[in-house]
Design a protein with these regions (language model features):
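Extended, small-residue-rich solenoid/repeat segments and analogous flexible loops
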Residues: 1-41
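Glycine-rich hexapeptide-repeat left-handed beta-helix
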Residues: 1-9, 45, 59-60, 70-73, ...
Length: 202
C-alpha cells in the first residue's frame, strides 16, 4: 500500500518492487532495484526516509523517519525480517539481521553488521566494517559492545543520552521515578494523528 501523508507521497523507482501488503507512507524515496517484501513498513512521520539502490527490505521490517530524525539507507544494504530502524543513518553495504534494532541518531558506517537481535542504541556510531554480535548491545560514541546482562554498564553510557528527551521531548524523571507514560502517549498520539488523513495512492 502506497500512502500520501502530510501532502507528501512516496517516490519509488520503476525498477523496484513493493509487496502488495507492505506499506510505504509519506516522504519516502526508494532507489533502483530495491525489494520491499511482504509486511514491511516504511513510514516517514515528520522526517523523510531515503533508501538507496539495490537494497533488500525483508518481511515485517519497520523503517521509520521520526520527529527530528530522518532515516537514510545507502546502497546495497540488507534489512532482515522483523528488524526495526528509527531515525538512523545506514551507510552503504550494511547488513542488519533478523530482529535487530537501530535507534534514533545512530550511524552505521559502511560495511558494518548488526547480527540477529543486536541493538544499536541512541546516537551510537558503528565504525566501518564493525560487527555487533548476536543479542549484544552497541552503545555510545566511541562505541562499546556489551552483553544484555551488563545493565549497569549499558546504563552508564545510555543515561546521559536521555532517551525520553531525545525521542519524546520529555526530560527523564528524577531518580527512582517511572517515566510519565500518560505524557508520552499523549505526545505520540498527537504526532501520529495526521495518519487519520492519509490518502491511499495505490
Amino acid at each position: 500500500m502506497i500512502l500520501k501523508h502530510l501532502d507528501k507521497e512516496p517516490v519509488i523507482d520503476i525498477s523496484s518492487f513493493v509487496a502488495p501488503n507492505a506499506v510505504v507512507c509519506g516522504d519516502v524515496t526508494i532507489g533502483k532495484n530495491v525489494r520491499v517484501m511482504f509486511g514491511a513498513q516504511i513510514i516517514a512521520e515528520s522526517s523523510p526516509v531515503i533508501i538507496g539502490d539495490n537494497c533488500i527490505i525483508l518481511e515485517n521490517a519497520v523503517i521509520r523517519g521520526t520527529d527530528r530524525f530522518p532515516l537514510k539507507i545507502g546502497n546495497n544494504c540488507l534489512v532482515g525480517p522483523n528488524a526495526h530502524l528509527a531515525g538512523c543513518t545506514v551507510e552503504d553495504e550494511v547488513f542488519i539481521a533478523t530482529g535487530a534494532s537501530v535507534f534514533h541518531g545512530a550511524i552505521l558506517k559502511r560495511g558494518s553488521e548488526v547480527r540477529i537481535n543486536g541493538v544499536v542504541h541512541l546516537k551510537t556510531v558503528l565504525p566501518e566494517n564493525f560487527s555487533v554480535p548476536i543479542n549484544w548491545i552497541a552503545v555510545g560514541h566511541p562505541v562499546k559492545i556489551l552483553s544484555p546482562d551488563k545493565h549497569d554498564e549499558i546504563w552508564k553510557v545510555q543515561k546521559p543520552l536521555n532517551f525520553p528527551l531525545t525521542v519524546y521531548g520529555i526530560d527523564r524523571p528524577e531518580s527512582g521515578e517511572s517515566n510519565n507514560m500518560a505524557d508520552i502517549c499523549k505526545i505520540m498520539s498527537d504526532r501520529l494523528k495526521p495518519h487519520m488523513d492519509n490518502e491511499i495512492m495505490e
